[in-house]
Amino acid sequence: MTVKTPVYLDYAATTPVDKRVAEKMIPYLTETFGNPASNSHAFGWTAEEAVEKARADIAALINADPKEIVFTSGATESDNLAIKGAANFYKTKGKHLITVKTEHKAVLDTMRELERQGFEVTYLGVQENGLIDLEELKAAIRDDTILISIMWVNNEIGVVQNIPAIGEICRERKIAFHVDAAQACGKVPVDVEAAKIDLLSMSAHKVYGPKGIGALYVRRKPRVRLEAQMHGGGHERGFRSGTLPTHQIVGMGEAFRIAKEELAQDTAHYLKLRDIFLKGIEGIEEVYINGDLEHRAPNNLNVSFNFVEGESLIMAVKELAVSSGSACTSASLEPSYVLRALGRNDELAHSSLRITFGRMTTEEEVQFAAELIKSKIGKLRELSPLWEMFKDGIDLNSIEWAAH
């Protein structure tokens, strides 16, 4: 089996641009280069037409009206615009916000900033499987709660929250509901109407589109109001000023159009790859899958291998592009805050690999990855005195380690 290395298995960090998407983008860099806001000549009209076509394709994937799509630079900006924008607009009604401890940093750090500005935030914990307890959410809601922000698919462990049930709770209590769907679009069916979502963040580069472009869905009926965070020429109905990057928008539109069309075949492909990988690592002892396997994005596996250091494992499998945690925070050697929230101890949180498959991943690559990981785990454990003690039946928790 000859597999070209390194094998890319980090599709939750970013995806390659689909060739069909790249082809669609190129003319808008050189020939059709007009500014979509130039409404006095054909160059501008052609560009605007392309932007509106993309807007419609993005809206179609999430069952929205094209008028509800606001272009941004990515999901981080969309999260900021949604959360700060709604919090500041509705602050006369109350200053209490609710989110979850396992959210992406783009949501958590935005919430922290609002706390500095005098808002109060409740951070909900999750159960061992990574899902929130809906009763706990209901209990956290107060009369002055104005916004709830909960991600659809977790970027580290891939668990899928029960978004329609949460949407129902928010609508009943007349609270604005924001969902970070950066990892959900193209992996699970997304329907803003059925799930009663008010604000939804999207990114192109997680869906085989270009980096640097995203969108925010802003509900019109019942209307959700936001305070703009970026001021200027009043583009995007005043929500987000700045010249629209036609080529990137066209890329995002085409990527989302393909994602809608090929969702079923992509899903089947991911599940097949996941099964091959899980079968391939069968027989390794002390392996823990992090997060619920039922309620999960089909392309995500987050696995902890006990008695192996995550960093040394990543070095050992340098033929694979995998990560320990999210790309945004993998530079820090802190154990993953998401895994800690599941109740995993530091050792297990440190020994995890996030393996995420994509449209371009082949069965041979996954087979190769599983076999490589299996052999390296064996070698690394042979070097571990703790593994030896564990195999000898010694309860490691009962040992008192001497301080040097």
From Swiss-Prot:
An example Gene Ontology biological process: [2Fe-2S] cluster assembly
Any one GO molecular function term: 2 iron, 2 sulfur cluster binding
Annotated InterPro entries: Aminotrans_V_dom, Aminotrans_V_PyrdxlP_BS, Cys_deSase_IscS, Cysteine_dSase, PyrdxlP-dep_Trfase, PyrdxlP-dep_Trfase_major, PyrdxlP-dep_Trfase_small
Protein EC: 2.8.1.7
Pfam families from the UniProt entry: Aminotran_5
Catalytic reactions on record: (sulfur carrier)-H + L-cysteine = (sulfur carrier)-SH + L-alanine
Cofactor(s) essential for the protein: pyridoxal 5'-phosphate
Catalytic residues, chain numbering: C328 (cysteine persulfide intermediate)
Gene from which the chain derives: iscS
Protein name: Cysteine desulfurase IscS
Family according to the record: Belongs to the class-V pyridoxal-phosphate-dependent aminotransferase family. NifS/IscS subfamily.
Taxonomic source organism: Neisseria gonorrhoeae (strain ATCC 700825 / FA 1090)
Keyword terms: 2Fe-2S, Cytoplasm, Iron, Iron-sulfur, Metal-binding, Pyridoxal phosphate, Transferase
N6-(pyridoxal phosphate)lysine: residues bearing it: K206
PROSITE patterns: AA_TRANSFER_CLASS_5
Single GO cellular component term: L-cysteine desulfurase complex
Pathway(s) served: Cofactor biosynthesis; iron-sulfur cluster biosynthesis
